[in-house]
Amino acid sequence: MDVQTKYGAGQNKVLGGANQKKIVESEEDIALPELNPSVPQAIQRARNALKMTQKELAFKINERPGVINEYESGSAIPSQAVLSKLEKALNVKLRGKEIGKPLK
């Protein structure tokens, strides 16, 4: 049996320095999207009109109840997929100019 050693094996080292500094600096400039202030109210009104709890709505759109709570409190980072599911479940527009109006 012959054992061979490869040149440079085991020499993988993490280089920090400049790349790490660029990442830290770039994170400060990132602006997260925010919900339109009328969206949480529209979700609450539509859900209450359908006499649904947050838990029931979450089950209907296959999300966690905490997600509904975040959207209704306005603290959620908006996701187009979740907003689309909410629109279909509540039959109310949650994006665009006519927020809170019934879907056609």
Swiss-Prot record:
Residues annotated as signal peptide: none
Gene3D superfamilies in alphabetical order: lambda repressor-like DNA-binding domains (1.10.260.40)
BP-aspect Gene Ontology terms: positive regulation of transcription by RNA polymerase II
Pfam families assigned: HTH_3 (PF01381)
DNA-binding feature ranges: 54-73
GO MF term set: DNA binding; transcription coactivator activity
InterPro entries: Cro/C1-type_HTH (IPR001387), Lambda_DNA-bd_dom_sf (IPR010982)
Residue stretches making up the HTH cro/C1-type domain: 43-97
This protein's GO CC annotations: nucleus
Keyword DNA-binding: yes
UniProt keyword terms in alphabetical order: DNA-binding
Superkingdom of the source species: Eukaryota
Entry protein name: Vegetative-specific protein H7
